[in-house]
């Protein structure tokens, strides 16, 4: 129920309030429209971006499909779903002929329709092919081609005979090979005594090389300037005289024993002077076999090979002169202390027995 209001009794609104109301309404409406416009533009931008991505994806898909060979030759109805295409009996059966049609035309009535196929039963097999035409039913060829046909028949007969003969020969060979026993395996070949001796000699040679390795060859020395050699003497250094020792003096009055041994220094051995003229035998030394040694090694291995180790000659050097020791060196003997006139109780006979 609507309440009736009489606006004549209501006080009028002032112009200022009316203006304020209208301004608020316009401002709110404008803000709403601006907001709606902004949202619509944002949605349109998103939709355009999605459409652009979809176009790019479709172009890539077209490129990939275009790179596949033989895709265009496929039938266009390959993706169409296959429905049941078996004809129904109601659609295939023609309508029954009327009596007027049968009486007016002399055409015999059509045969009765075949029974409907049962589900799950395979269809009947197709009829067999017609029998091949025999040679008797073939009409004779013309006279111009009779000779060529006869020659071809002869060639075929000859080929068939050759094939039959080859098959018989193969069967005979198979029978013969099956009847024969397999050949015995070959006897193993034993190594000969000569090859064993050669192998033994090679092993012994390797052992000798390991025992007597070849010394490294000295590298040639570069020539260096040498001073002129001093005059050499072929004679040896004279032996110095023995040191002077005092004669035994038994007539002295001291109590020392003059028969005591005197201390003397022996003469040094004569020094050999090295000269440039050396015997040719010093250039190399041969390693002779000694079968009379007391060691337990097998000297027969050394007799098998007369290899000798050659030692190279040392480089020539200047003569070395060694001076003789001094001859005036004399060391006196220590004095012996004895007292025969002592008053002790020891036995002096022990001292006299010296």
Swiss-Prot record:
<feature type="compositionally biased region" description="Acidic residues">
    <location>
        <begin position="342"/>
        <end position="354"/>
    </location>
</feature>
<feature type="compositionally biased region" description="Acidic residues">
    <location>
        <begin position="251"/>
        <end position="260"/>
    </location>
</feature>
<dbReference type="GO" id="GO:0044655">
    <property type="term" value="P:phagosome reneutralization"/>
</dbReference>
<comment type="subunit">
    <text>Probable component of the WASH complex.</text>
</comment>
<protein>
    <recommendedName>
        <fullName>WASH complex subunit 3</fullName>
    </recommendedName>
</protein>
<dbReference type="GO" id="GO:0061474">
    <property type="term" value="C:phagolysosome membrane"/>
</dbReference>
<dbReference type="GO" id="GO:0030041">
    <property type="term" value="P:actin filament polymerization"/>
</dbReference>
<feature type="compositionally biased region" description="Acidic residues">
    <location>
        <begin position="150"/>
        <end position="159"/>
    </location>
</feature>
<feature type="compositionally biased region" description="Acidic residues">
    <location>
        <begin position="293"/>
        <end position="307"/>
    </location>
</feature>
<feature type="compositionally biased region" description="Pro residues">
    <location>
        <begin position="107"/>
        <end position="143"/>
    </location>
</feature>
<dbReference type="InterPro" id="IPR019309">
    <property type="entry name" value="WASHC3"/>
</dbReference>
<feature type="compositionally biased region" description="Low complexity">
    <location>
        <begin position="277"/>
        <end position="290"/>
    </location>
</feature>
<comment type="similarity">
    <text>Belongs to the CCDC53 family.</text>
</comment>
<feature type="compositionally biased region" description="Pro residues">
    <location>
        <begin position="213"/>
        <end position="244"/>
    </location>
</feature>
<dbReference type="Pfam" id="PF10152">
    <property type="entry name" value="CCDC53"/>
</dbReference>
<feature type="region of interest" description="Disordered">
    <location>
        <begin position="76"/>
        <end position="354"/>
    </location>
</feature>
<dbReference type="GO" id="GO:0006887">
    <property type="term" value="P:exocytosis"/>
</dbReference>
<dbReference type="GO" id="GO:0071203">
    <property type="term" value="C:WASH complex"/>
</dbReference>
């Amino acid at each position: 129920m609507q309440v009736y209001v009489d606006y004549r009794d209501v006080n009028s609104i002032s112009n200022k309030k009316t203006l304020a109301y209208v301004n608020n309404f316009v401002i709110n409406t404008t803000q709403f429209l601006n907001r709606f416009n902004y949202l619509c533009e944002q949605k349109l931008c998103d939709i355009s971006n999605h459409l652009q991505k979809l176009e790019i994806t479709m172009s890539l898909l077209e490129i990939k499909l275009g790179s596949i060979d033989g895709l265009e030759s496929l039938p266009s109805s390959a993706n169409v779903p296959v429905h049941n295409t078996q004809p129904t009996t109601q659609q295939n059966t023609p309508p029954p002929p009327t009596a007027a049609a049968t009486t007016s035309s002399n055409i015999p009535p059509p045969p009765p329709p075949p029974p409907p196929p049962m589900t799950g039963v395979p269809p009947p097999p197709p009829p067999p092919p017609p029998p091949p035409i025999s040679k008797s039913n073939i009409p004779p060829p013309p006279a111009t081609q009779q000779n060529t046909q006869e020659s071809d028949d002869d060639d075929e007969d000859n080929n068939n005979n050759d094939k039959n003969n080859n098959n018989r020969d193969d069967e005979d060979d198979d029978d013969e090979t099956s009847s024969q026993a397999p050949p015995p395996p070959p006897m193993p070949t034993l190594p000969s005594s000569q090859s064993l001796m050669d192998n033994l000699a090679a092993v012994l040679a390797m052992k000798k090389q390991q025992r007597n390795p070849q010394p490294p060859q000295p590298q040639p020395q570069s020539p260096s300037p040498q001073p002129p050699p001093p005059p050499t003497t072929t004679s040896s250094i004279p032996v110095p005289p023995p040191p002077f020792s005092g004669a035994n003096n038994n007539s002295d009055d001291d109590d020392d024993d003059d028969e005591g041994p005197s201390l003397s220094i022996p003469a040094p051995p004569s020094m050999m002077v090295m000269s440039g003229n050396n015997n040719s035998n010093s250039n190399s030394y041969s390693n002779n076999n000694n079968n009379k040694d007391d060691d337990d090694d097998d000297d027969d291995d050394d007799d098998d090979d007369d290899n000798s180790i050659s030692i190279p000659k040392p480089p020539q050097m200047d003569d070395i002169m060694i001076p003789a020791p001094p001859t005036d060196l004399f060391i006196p003997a220590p004095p012996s202390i004895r007292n025969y006139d002592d008053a002790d109780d020891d036995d002096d006979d022990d001292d006299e027995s010296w």
